[in-house]
Amino acid sequence: SFKWRAAAAVLAMLVLAGVGVSVGGGTSFFRLGTIVSRFTGKAAKVVYRIQGIPVTQQEIQAGVALRVENGETVKTAKKEVIKDIITKKTLYVLAKKNGCTVSDQEYDDYAKLLKTQMNKAENRKGIRDFYAGFGGESAYWKNMEPVIRQNLAVRKYIDSQTGTQTEEEIKQEAYESGAKQTDLDAFEQVVEDVCEEIGDYLKTLQKSDASVYYFASSDKERVTESGG
């Protein structure tokens, strides 16, 4: 059976947005919502495929932008996005091969659970600000549903394998397998090209003054605050 995990609210919002980075706080939740919506609110443009699974321009740009907002250099952000996308797409391929699908009922149940958590969270004002920056709560859920479904299928697969391996081992194995099946030079060039289009925007993020961030890993259910 599928283990529903009580993920921390903001972590869930941003990680489930498919950008693979756990950030919050910063200059403002509104700003984070704006960054995510800047890319995910547009029609998806497929720029590459990993084992047949589409990679969109938007997920690359959003992933890099959020990491830069989180204090990373553009160069480091690109490297991490490449690894994250290869890992994520490979895990999704494995999930499909192992019959890990997500029914409408499972999605609806999870969405309801997540919305309830967000409404009860101590940082719910920040979450409302995030929604506002995104363009509204309904806009967030509408745009994120396909990505959330994919991530839930991956979650099912990981949960089915954790009896013999840790989550990190599963992810590392998926990355190594996926990297061998990916033309890394070609994919890196695609990432360079799509990030060049938002070069000026990334520079503005690098200059921002973010002092407080929230971090959490996928195997922890609480969010800890850290000054930076």
Regions inferred by a protein language model and the residue ranges of each:
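N-terminal targeting/tethering segments
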Residues: 32-142
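Short, low-structural-confidence N-terminal segments
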Residues: 1-77, 185-228
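Solvent-exposed, amphipathic alpha-helical "stalk/arm" or coiled-coil-like segments used as scaffolds
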Residues: 74-97, 127-217
